[in-house]
């Protein structure tokens, strides 16, 4: 034998001891109490937020009501108070909006906390499901162990059957060939009685064993039912989890806000979140109860299995003791006499009948075992199907990625916000364009009206100049007339008899002059009437222009409202279009996901086919093994029967030969002895007859035995041929099945590669489309920035144009007021002029009357000069003439004063116009300064924001640089660690290659030395072959490990490249921010220069204006006061005119009375007709002047009505201006809200881009994991091929062994003995390794007492390496732990190498069964077993008792209770680390 230092495979399965359900329930309960507290705090925060929302809504409603009331009463209040109140309300709105934004932030934080709770909830559910699955697997393992024990009981029964056949053979052989010494009859009877008692005892023991086997069957059925119930409960819990997930998904899909209703959406979100939390916590509690119940049932089942194992162990010990006792009794060697052949044959017959009964029972038991094996295979298949369904559901739930849905929702929201902003921008653009157009029209109209007004003012000035010239002429003529009258009076006084002709000529000249003057006055009046009509027309045009302006403003407001209404429809249209686009993208994504799922399903179907093929192969192997065992048992039975027959036939032949010799001797004696007596002849003849009958009987029996032997041999040959045929058929079916599976694997692999390529192309297309969308979003953001700048400039222009419009309207109002005041003054002056003219006419008439009377008196009588001087009437007339002259002088003086006042008014108007122009310039400059200050503030705010973002970016850059440095260091350390691991694995691979060479040489040497392999030689060759196969597998696993490490290196390199790409992106962002800051600083410098220029211009204007600017702040109030004073003066003039009209009416009445008196007095005279005609003319002129006065009164009333209309229109314009101011403030607030929405939208876009990058990273990581899983699956296929090759080698070995089985009887009996002894040893080793009894655990503990601390360290290392597989930080931790535990691993290697031993030889039949059944176990635990054999990792799956022995007592404190100690023990165990995470989270 070769003594080689090697590691031996430890095939023992160490059962894991779980903590009690009470402890887990305690930890879960504490976790959920914490979660309930958090939920209560969240609900209280939500209630507080709801109260705040209600308060905010109430404030908003109050604010809106106040705003409406102010709009209705705004026309009566002053502009200053309304603007201050609007500012206060704008500040209130801004504060409310800030509060709303804070509430939004708190709501987002609450949503994030709720998602975190849901994630922790899903993690705990997964971990508890894992515990449940572990319990289920432990129950299944115990069930498999019971099945193995059941098979071991059947093997023991077969062994007992073989022992009984041996007893029968020994009894049958020992009968005639006993010692020649005869025993007494009593001894023989006692011996027979003893043997029958022994056989009865054996039968009783066998019946007891069968009863125990039936009990085991019933217990196995109960275990199967428990497994079915556990599977049903697991399916129920999975369905409940699916329902919870579907509810959660349905709740997630219902979270859409409609039409931007922020308050209602927020409340709905909060209510939905609260209800969802309640539902989730209720579902969580219900699942807790279900999982607790399942865990309790699992614990009960585990206890039952432990009890059953203990009972089976007891039964096994009792059976072993009974067998030992019986073999001791049998091996004592009982003897009996030759005389009692009949009794011996009776005992043998009883034994044969018992043996046949036992054989029938064994056949029934084997059939039952096969039936049970079929049930077990079906149950295993169902379990695999359930696992496959669970994996499919898990994959489907993982494929339904929530991140993609969130990304789509965020994209929809951002696009909707962007469309809304575009619509608002378009709306503001249209409004601005409409206002610009309207302003241009108004400016054109105003220019035209100004030109016309200037023309008419020039006409009025020209007419006023003509009136002045005419007045001067009239005054000159009146002076000349007065001079002539004076001369005439002097002449009349000096000359007593003037000539009547001279007076008449003079009178005619005066009349002609008066007519010319009257004609000139008529022309002037007609021209004045035309000018008044033009002025009225101009006023009417101004009124129409005001109405047009009002209509235009109303139209603009209506257009704005209509545009707002139409914008909703446009928004809906854009929404629908974007939804259609998103639906198309969604459909494309769904198609790709469906293709991916289809390929996954195909791959799963392939794996299911592989697993089903593997189960079929295992079932075929089991069936082959069972059939081979059955055939070998039948062959051994047949060989035993043949040997029994031969052992019976040989003494019969010897007896027949003895009888023939005795017969011949007797015949010889008969022939020789003829002289004997009749007695002897009769006795000899009777003896001859008896001998002859006995010989015949023996010959018949011999022939019968030969026929039975021939039949048994034929049956044996049939069995051998049947066994060969079944093996060949199974080989052919397996080969065909393997070929079809290989073809299916090849086709599916090709399909999977094609699907993967198409999916990769589609994914690349989707990534390109998403990049395009991101570029479009960036372009839209840039366009939005440009639009914001344009909107700001347009708003500034709008404000400037509004200010200019206001100033122009004020100018127009002032000019209208001045025109009205001038018109009233002109009308008053003209009324005065008309009055004076009428007085002059009356005076002229009276003068003519007096002259006529004088002439009459002169012609009638020629009194003396004294009488003429003393006439009373003459004196009276002289007095009236004097009074009239005084009045004429007064009138002239008043006309001069009025003309002087008018010139002063014109100067004052010119001065006011100059002041208005200066005020307009100053106000425009002030507005420009205010706008530039606003722009500076805006740009300074932008600069501040950009600086703050630059600080953040610099911090991020520093952090990223630090992370990159640490990441580079970590990557270097990881690469060094990988290099070390690869080097170590390369050394191990080299060692394994050397070991493989040594093993192949040893196997060849053993086979060459042991050509005729028998017994131990076969076992050693099988052992070395198995060891060679395991070492080859270990070497392949090491190669695979190297590939995994290289793939991890590739993954880390890809992550490093991604980090570098993010660094480049951050640098680009930083440079863009720096450029934006530079541009902002340049714009601010330009604006400051503009402000300084405006201030210098303002100072220059103030210096130019001098002292007049002191009146500028009070200009508005003073203008209003002047306007009111002028209005009061006009009203006073109207009153004076009315009083004058009443006075003129009284004068008219006096004149009428005078006329009556004159008519009564001058009735006798000759020229009455002439006087009456003169008087009639005077009356017509008086009526004419009266009509003119009435027309003037009507015109004055019209002018007053027009003044009232202008005042009303002015008030309306002021109200409209206030409404425009309110609209402007609303537009400004809307712009501010739009800016806030834009910033929030940019933040959402940034968040969305971050989420998108995270989703891309997750997608790439999942794709890498998928590729790794595919590599693992290909490796599994390779292992399947290796297993098939091993199966073929085993089959060839089986055929070779079958050929060697047909040897000699001694070799067969020796082989049978070696099989029995090997079965006993193997059953003892398998039962000791597979059972979970306290004996095996204590034995393993005794073997591993020396290395508990090292096992604990290695357990930590393995746990960390399992839990942290793909992150660089965790690899760094694993490196540190590996460095810390190098000493322990080297120690473990030394200890494991010093403990290598050689296993005892395994019998061939058991070796065949072991090699056929333990392939799956080797395939499942190959990786773990490799690590155990290599010494890298030791067995980490300790029980909780062993872990409590290694528990660190320093973690405990003095104040800890028993519950705290138990919780700390459980949470410090790496197996229950997830409970620690959920407890802390």
Swiss-Prot record:
<keyword id="KW-0946">Virion</keyword>
<protein>
    <recommendedName>
        <fullName>Structural protein ORF147</fullName>
    </recommendedName>
</protein>
<feature type="compositionally biased region" description="Low complexity">
    <location>
        <begin position="73"/>
        <end position="84"/>
    </location>
</feature>
<feature type="region of interest" description="Disordered">
    <location>
        <begin position="1319"/>
        <end position="1403"/>
    </location>
</feature>
<feature type="region of interest" description="Disordered">
    <location>
        <begin position="65"/>
        <end position="88"/>
    </location>
</feature>
<keyword id="KW-0677">Repeat</keyword>
<feature type="compositionally biased region" description="Low complexity">
    <location>
        <begin position="1393"/>
        <end position="1403"/>
    </location>
</feature>
<feature type="compositionally biased region" description="Low complexity">
    <location>
        <begin position="1323"/>
        <end position="1336"/>
    </location>
</feature>
<dbReference type="GO" id="GO:0044423">
    <property type="term" value="C:virion component"/>
</dbReference>
């Amino acid at each position: 034998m070769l003594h080689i230092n090697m590691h031996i495979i430890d095939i023992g399965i160490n059962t894991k001891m779980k903590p009690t359900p009470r402890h887990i329930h305690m930890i879960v309960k504490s976790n959920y109490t914490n979660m309930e507290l958090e939920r209560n705090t969240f609900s209280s925060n939500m209630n507080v937020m709801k109260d705040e929302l209600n308060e905010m809504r109430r404030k908003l409603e109050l604010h809106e009501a106040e705003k409406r009331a102010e709009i209705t009463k705004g026309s009566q209040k002053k502009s200053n108070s309304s603007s201050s109140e609007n500012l206060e309300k704008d500040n209130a709105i801004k504060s409310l909006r800030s509060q709303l934004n804070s509430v939004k932030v708190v709501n987002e934080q609450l949503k994030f906390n709720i998602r975190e709770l849901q994630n922790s909830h899903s993690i705990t559910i997964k971990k508890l499901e894992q515990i449940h699955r572990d319990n289920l697997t432990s129950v299944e393992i115990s069930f498999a162990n019971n099945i193995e024990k059941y098979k071991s009981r059947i093997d023991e029964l077969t062994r007992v059957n073989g022992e009984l056949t041996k007893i029968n053979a020994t009894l049958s052989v020992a009968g005639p060939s006993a010692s020649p010494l005869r025993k007494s009859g009593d001894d023989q009877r006692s011996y027979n009685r003893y043997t029958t008692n022994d056989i009865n005892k054996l039968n009783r023991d066998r019946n007891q064993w069968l009863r125990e086997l039936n009990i085991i069957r019933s217990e196995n059925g109960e275990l199967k039912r428990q497994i079915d119930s556990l599977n049903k409960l697991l399916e129920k819990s999975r369905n409940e989890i699916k329902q919870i997930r579907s509810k959660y998904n349905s709740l997630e899909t219902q979270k859409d806000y409609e039409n931007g209703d922020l308050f209602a959406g927020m409340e709905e979100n909060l209510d939905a979140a609260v209800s969802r939390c309640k539902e989730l916590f209720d579902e969580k509690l219900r699942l807790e109860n279900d999982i607790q119940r399942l865990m309790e049932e699992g614990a009960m089942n585990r206890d039952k299995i432990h009890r059953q194992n203990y009972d089976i162990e007891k039964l096994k010990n009792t059976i072993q003791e009974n067998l030992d006792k019986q073999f001791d009794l049998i091996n004592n060697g009982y003897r009996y006499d030759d005389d009692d052949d009949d009794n011996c044959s009776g005992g043998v017959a009883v034994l044969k009948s018992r043996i046949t009964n036992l054989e029938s029972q064994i056949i029934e038991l084997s059939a039952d075992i096969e039936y049970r094996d079929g049930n077990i295979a079906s149950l295993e298949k169902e379990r695999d199907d359930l696992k496959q369904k669970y994996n499919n559901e898990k994959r489907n739930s993982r494929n339904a990625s929530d991140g993609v849905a969130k990304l789509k929702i965020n994209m929809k929201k951002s696009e909707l916000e962007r469309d809304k902003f575009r619509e608002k921008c378009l709306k503001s653009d249209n409004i601005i364009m409409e206002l610009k157009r309207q302003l241009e029209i108004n400016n054109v109209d105003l220019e035209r009206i100004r030109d016309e007004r200037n023309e008419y003012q020039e006409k009025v000035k020209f007419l006023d100049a003509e009136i002045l010239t005419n007045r001067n002429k009239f005054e000159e003529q009146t002076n000349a007339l007065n001079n002539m009258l004076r001369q005439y009076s002097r002449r009349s006084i000096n000359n007593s008899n003037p000539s009547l002709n001279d007076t008449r000529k003079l009178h005619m000249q005066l009349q002609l002059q008066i007519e010319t003057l009257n004609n000139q006055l008529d022309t002037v009046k007609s021209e004045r009437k035309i000018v008044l009509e033009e002025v009225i027309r101009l006023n009417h045009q101004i009124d129409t222009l005001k109405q047009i302006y009002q209509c235009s403003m109303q139209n603009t407001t209506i257009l704005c409202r209509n545009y707002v209404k139409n914008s909703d429809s446009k928004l809906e249209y854009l929404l629908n279009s974007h939804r259609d686009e998103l639906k198309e993208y969604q459909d494309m994504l769904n198609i790709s996901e469906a293709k991916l799922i289809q390929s996954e399903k195909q791959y799963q179907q392939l794996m299911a086919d592989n697993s089903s093929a593997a189960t079929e192969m295992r079932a075929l192997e089991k069936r082959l093994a069972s059939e081979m065992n059955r055939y070998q048992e039948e062959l051994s039975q047949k060989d035993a029967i043949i040997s029994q027959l031969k052992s019976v036939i040989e003494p019969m032949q010897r007896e027949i030969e003895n009888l023939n010799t005795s017969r011949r001797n007797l015949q010889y004696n008969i022939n020789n002895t003829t002289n004997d007596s009749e007695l002897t002849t009769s006795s000899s003849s009777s003896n001859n007859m008896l001998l002859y009958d006995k010989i015949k009987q023996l010959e018949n029996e011999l022939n019968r035995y030969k026929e039975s032997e021939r039949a048994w041999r034929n049956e044996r040959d049939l069995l051998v041929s049947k066994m060969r045929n079944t093996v060949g058929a199974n080989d052919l079916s397996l080969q065909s099945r393997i070929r079809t599976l290989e073809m299916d694997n090849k086709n599916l692999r090709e399909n999977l590669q094609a699907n993967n390529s198409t999916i990769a192309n589609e994914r690349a297309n989707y990534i390109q489309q998403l990049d395009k969308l991101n570029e479009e979003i960036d372009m839209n953001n840039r366009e939005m920035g440009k639009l914001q700048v344009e909107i700001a400039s347009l708003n500034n222009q709008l404000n400037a144009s509004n200010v200019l419009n206001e100033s122009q309207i004020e100018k127009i109002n002032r000019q209208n007021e001045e025109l009205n005041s001038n018109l009233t003054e002109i009308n008053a002056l003209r009324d005065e002029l008309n009055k004076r003219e009428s007085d002059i006419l009356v005076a002229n008439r009276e003068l003519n009357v007096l002259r006529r009377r004088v002439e009459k008196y002169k012609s009638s009588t020629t009194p003396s000069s004294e009488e003429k001087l003393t006439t009373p009437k003459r004196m009276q007339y002289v007095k009236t003439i004097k009074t009239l002259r005084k009045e004429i002088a007064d009138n002239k003086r008043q006309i001069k004063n009025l003309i002087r006042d008018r010139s002063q008014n014109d100067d004052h108007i010119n001065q006011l116009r100059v002041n208005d122009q200066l005020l307009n310039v100053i106000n425009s400059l002030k507005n420009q300064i205010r706008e530039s200050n606003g722009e500076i503030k805006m740009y300074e705010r932008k600069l501040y924001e950009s600086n703050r973002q630059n600080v953040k970016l610099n911090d991020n850059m520093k952090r990223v640089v630090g992370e990159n440095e640490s990441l580079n260091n970590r990557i270097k350390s990881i690469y060094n660690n990988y290099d070390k691991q690869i080097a170590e694995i390369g050394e191990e691979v080299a060692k394994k290659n050397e070991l493989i060479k040594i093993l192949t040489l040893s196997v060849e040497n053993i086979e060459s030395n042991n050509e005729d392999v028998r017994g131990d030689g076969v076992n050693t060759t099988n052992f070395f072959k198995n060891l060679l196969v395991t070492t080859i597998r270990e070497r392949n696993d090491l190669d695979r490990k190297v590939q995994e490490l290289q793939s991890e290196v590739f993954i880390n390199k890809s992550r490093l490249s991604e980090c570098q790409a993010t660094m480049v992106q951050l640098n680009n962002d930083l440079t863009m921010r720096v450029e934006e800051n530079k541009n902002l600083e340049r714009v601010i410098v330009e604006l400051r220069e503009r402000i300084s220029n405006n201030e210098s211009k303002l100072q220059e204007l103030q210096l130019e204006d001098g002292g007049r600017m002191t009146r500028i702040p009070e200009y508005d109030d003073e203008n209003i006061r002047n306007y009111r004073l002028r209005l009061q003066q006009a009203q006073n003039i109207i009153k004076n005119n009315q009083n004058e009209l009443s006075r003129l009416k009284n004068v008219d009445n006096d004149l009428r009375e005078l006329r009556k008196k004159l008519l009564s007095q001058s009735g006798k005279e000759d020229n009455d007709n002439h006087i009456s005609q003169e008087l009639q003319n005077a009356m017509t002129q008086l009526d004419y002047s009266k009509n003119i006065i009435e027309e003037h009164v009507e015109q004055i009333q019209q002018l007053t009505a027009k003044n009232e209309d202008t005042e009303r229109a002015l008030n309306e314009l002021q109200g409209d201006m206030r409404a425009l101011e309110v609209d402007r403030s609303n537009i400004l607030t809307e712009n501010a809200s739009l800016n806030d929405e834009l910033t929030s939208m940019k933040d959402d876009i940034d968040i969305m881009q971050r989420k998108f990058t995270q989703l891309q990273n997750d997608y790439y990581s999942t794709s890498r994991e998928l590729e790794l899983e595919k590599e693992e699956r290909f490796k599994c296929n390779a292992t399947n091929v290796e297993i098939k090759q091993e199966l073929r080698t085993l089959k060839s070995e089986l055929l070779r062994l079958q050929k060697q089985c047909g040897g000699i009887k001694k070799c067969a009996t020796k082989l049978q003995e070696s099989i029995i002894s090997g079965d006993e040893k193997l059953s003892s080793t398998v039962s000791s390794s597979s059972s979970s009894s306290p004996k095996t655990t204590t034995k393993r503990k005794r073997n591993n007492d020396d290395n508990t601390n090292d096992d604990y360290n290695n357990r930590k290392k393995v746990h960390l390496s399992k839990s942290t597989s793909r992150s660089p930080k965790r690899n760094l931790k694993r490196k540190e732990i590996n460095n810390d535990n190098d000493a322990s691993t080297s120690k473990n290697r030394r200890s494991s190498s010093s403990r290598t031993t050689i296993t005892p030889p395994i019998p061939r039949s058991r070796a065949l069964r072991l090699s056929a059944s333990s392939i799956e176990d080797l395939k499942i635990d190959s990786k773990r077993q490799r690590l155990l054999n290599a010494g890298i990792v030791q067995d980490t799956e300790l029980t909780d008792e062993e872990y409590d022995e290694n528990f660190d007592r320093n973690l405990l404190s003095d104040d800890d209770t028993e519950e705290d100690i138990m919780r700390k023990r459980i949470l410090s165990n790496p197996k229950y680390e997830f409970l620690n995470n959920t407890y802390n989270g």
